[in-house]
Amino acid sequence: MRIDELFWNDENVGHLWSAHQVTPDEIEEIIFGVEGEEPTYRIRRDGDFYCISGETGSGRLLNMVGELLENNRFRVFGARDMNQKELRAYRRGK
């Protein structure tokens, strides 16, 4: 799966912050990488949705859920810090 652009609106930005204090910038760092580095996220499909795990430029480890839209745009529904089980699985798969 290729992601060229992230879809943001007031609803998903507000939910990310109010529920888990995650910013759009953190999501973009995971998907597109930080300057001079390639992104290193893991992705898996769960029905119509995708679960993406990755690390921000500051080292925060997040899981996010969203859907692929037309033209390789991706809408994030939610994101949160990884729990211990997810963290172990992410580190094993890197």
Describe the role of every protein-language-model region:
Residues 1-94:
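Ribonuclease/tRNase effector modules and their secretory precursors
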